[in-house]
């Protein structure tokens, strides 16, 4: 439910951070 959604959003934020740092 909401906990899974929070974990997914956290994962997306981590990915976005990595992608942003790469550029």
UniProtKB/Swiss-Prot annotation:
Alphabetical keyword list: Amphibian defense peptide, Antibiotic, Antimicrobial, Fungicide, Immunity, Innate immunity, Secreted
Coiled coil: none
Localization annotation: Secreted
Gene Ontology, cellular component aspect: extracellular region
Tissue expression as described in the entry: Expressed by the skin glands.
Top-rank taxon: Eukaryota
InterPro entries to which the protein is assigned, alphabetical: Antimicrobial_19
Main localisation: secreted
GO biological process: defense response to bacterium; defense response to fungus; innate immune response; killing of cells of another organism; xenobiotic metabolic process
Family membership: Belongs to the frog skin active peptide (FSAP) family. Pseudin subfamily.
Described purpose of this protein according to its UniProt entry: Possesses antifungal activity against C.albicans and is also active against E.coli and S.aureus.
Protein name as catalogued: Pseudin-3
């Amino acid at each position: 439910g909401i906990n899974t959604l929070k974990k997914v959003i956290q994962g997306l934020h981590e990915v976005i951070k990595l992608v942003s740092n790469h550029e």
